[in-house]
Amino acid sequence: MSKGYVWVVDDDSSIRWVMEKTSPLPT
């Protein structure tokens, strides 16, 4: 599950972006 947001841990927007890309959850 941690194979995308390892380099985007510096911004909040980036984290939610990668999470949506790696795990398409119905938010």
From Swiss-Prot:
Entry PTM: Phosphorylated and dephosphorylated by NtrB.
Gene Ontology biological process terms, A to Z: nitrogen fixation; phosphorelay signal transduction system
Location(s), subcellular: Cytoplasm
GO CC term (a single one): cytoplasm
GO molecular function: ATP binding; DNA binding
Primary location group: cytoplasm
Electron transport in keyword set: no
Keywords of the record: Activator, ATP-binding, Cytoplasm, DNA-binding, Nitrogen fixation, Nucleotide-binding, Phosphoprotein, Repressor, Transcription, Transcription regulation, Two-component regulatory system
Function: Member of the two-component regulatory system NtrB/NtrC, which controls expression of the nitrogen-regulated (ntr) genes in response to nitrogen limitation. Phosphorylated NtrC binds directly to DNA and stimulates the formation of open promoter-sigma54-RNA polymerase complexes.
Record-given protein name: DNA-binding transcriptional regulator NtrC
Taxonomic source organism: Vibrio alginolyticus
Lineage: Bacteria, Pseudomonadati, Pseudomonadota, Gammaproteobacteria, Vibrionales
